[in-house]
Amino acid sequence: MQINFEPMPNSVTHLENNSPSRLKNNKTVEEHKEHEPDLQTQSEMRRESNGSPKDTAVTNQNGDQPHENVIHTQIIKKDNPFFNYMQDNVDGSDENGKNDDDDENAKNAGSDDNEDQLLQPNRRKNSKERRRSSVATSKDSSPDVPYNTLNHNASGMTKEGKKRAQILEASKVSEGQGRTYIAYAIKYGDSIVKRRYSDFESLRKVLVKLFPISLIPPIPEKQSLKSYGKAMTYSKSSYLLPTESGDSVDLSLSVINGPVTTNDEKLIRHRIRMLTSFLNRLLKNQEITKTSIVYDFLDPNNKNWNDLITSSLTISSLPKSVLQCNPIDPTNTTKAHSYLPVPSSSTQLLASKDNHSASDADEFTKIEAEFKNYEQLIHSGLYKYSRATTKEVNYLREDLKGISSEFAQLSTDETKNESGLAELLSHSSDAYGTLQEILETLVGNLHYNINEPLSECAHMATAVRDLIHYRRLKLIQKDILERTILYKRGQLIKFQQQENDHKQIDNMVKEELGTNGAVNLENPAGPQSYSGKFINKFTQLAIIIKDSVSYQEQDPAAAARSLEKELIQLDETLKVATSDLVVISETLKNTELPNFIKERDEELTQIFKNYAKYMKENATRNLEIWKELHNRIQEA
């Protein structure tokens, strides 16, 4: 396909490839449990904070004032989407005024501090270095657990070594006269470009025309600008990523990975994730990346995407309907494609159902039904019940938090009596508090790594059904052409028959008129015989018929010639439609559908593995807590 989009250079800035399965100093995830406070340490902290139920601001060991609703999610390097960003800050510390000639101990200490920041981004190591942000959570809030996209890591590169796009923030932009829109800052490589939702929508429409038989990933549904803009207005800086000059990686500041408190904020995050997935799926598509359209979309030099599209001769020359494009190369659409009918009425769609061949009904009709069933199973089945499970786990977390608080209050009351029951109640309070923290992490994992990927799988199934529906419309298109040709041929036979009838009538009239072509219609002087009267009546009737044929009906000969030319054009168009249908069917069966099924199976496998992993980790940690509580009760 030749498209007038110049591809961007293939130079890729070398980024350090940090394996997600390993941490600094070759420490595994399990070895970093030392960064998590043990049950005893948490017990001491909780005794101080829960000593009086009315005291909400209690100073902790570091001199901070812990907030009751602050998220304390343990983030390891493997799950940290900003690891590469922090690594760049560490490597470029000389730009911040630090001395590169520090001794080895200072370097090691700095490395440990940075590592601790990555592992526990929501905890302040030094109050003079950065200020801790307080984030209030509610029933709908979720801990900051990043969404691990398949085949992507946190360094901005895919496993294949290709760059990936990342939406850094969503901000409200004014375009004058009181009109505003939401702009998404997209980082690709070393460049950042801002695009609005209509730009994403326009890009997808163009891609559907340029690649009609390729699976184009979906984008999130268009939402009301009023509600969406309102969410952005009141979000302020709490939902923007850290600035480039910042030395903090506090995920609570991120619209992508931070905790959320309202449904509007969830909407913002959901749209950012869906649009990010849309761009990265396009960058993985080999057919689409052969052209430069996606790279032009990510190029900051093209500030106005709409102007670029409207000024492109390639895009403007495409037919309005994708059904009139050449499916192999829409930029090389022939004249015969312009004569293809565009099925628009529901009557045509319903009438075509009973006229398809048995083989087609057994093949693609069955495939479409299977994908429809798959979409329903994912969206109305797994996704629905997974969301319900996450909601119930979150409710359980809140209940455990309340139980922990009540045990702490009872422990305080029993302390006055100087009985051993106070210590047992304190241990129980600590255990329930730790359990709710574990469930907090589980809720975040289920929401971001299970629910949202399942929702994306359902949307991808919808895109596949749209592709199958396109093939079905092409089949209806071919059916309409066949019906039209049959009708036109019937009309041609009718006109040819009329022309023959007219010739016969003319011959009969000429025979009756005689060689001079005239007849005396006046009454003769003498009486006429019966045969003479009959001939006169027949002559008058023949003249009337000839006049009526000449002045009331279309010339059969001219109509027949016009139909013959039209049938020639229709036959050529039918050949094109038949050829297109064969190409579309083969591409869907042999390429697009198998590739989608393969990717779908990989994504679902990863989702189910994550689900089993999170549940196992939660159960293991629960068992450890209850065993530790049991041992303390036995010792008491």
Curated annotation (Swiss-Prot):
Residues 160-305 form the PX domain. Residues 1-68, 84-163 are annotated as: Disordered. Residues 27-49 have a biased composition (Basic and acidic residues). GO terms for cellular component: cytosol; endosome membrane; phagophore assembly site membrane. It is a peripheral membrane protein. SUPFAM superfamilies: PX domain. One of its GO terms (biological process) is protein transport. It is found in: Endosome membrane; Preautophagosomal structure membrane. Residues 10-23, 50-64 have a biased composition (Polar residues). Residues 122-133 have a biased composition (Basic residues). SMART domains: PX. GO terms for molecular function: phosphatidylinositol-3-phosphate binding. The keyword Membrane applies. Keywords: Autophagy, Endosome, Lipid-binding, Membrane, Protein transport, Transport. A 1,2-diacyl-sn-glycero-3-phospho-(1D-myo-inositol-3-phosphate) binds at R196, S198, K222, R271. The PX domain binds phosphatidylinositol 3-phosphate which is necessary for peripheral membrane localization to the perivacuolar punctate structures. Belongs to the sorting nexin family. Required for cytoplasm to vacuole transport (Cvt), pexophagy and mitophagy. Also involved in endoplasmic reticulum-specific autophagic process and is essential for the survival of cells subjected to severe ER stress. Functions in protein retrieval from the endocytic pathway. This is Autophagy-related protein 20. It comes from Kluyveromyces lactis (strain ATCC 8585 / CBS 2359 / DSM 70799 / NBRC 1267 / NRRL Y-1140 / WM37).
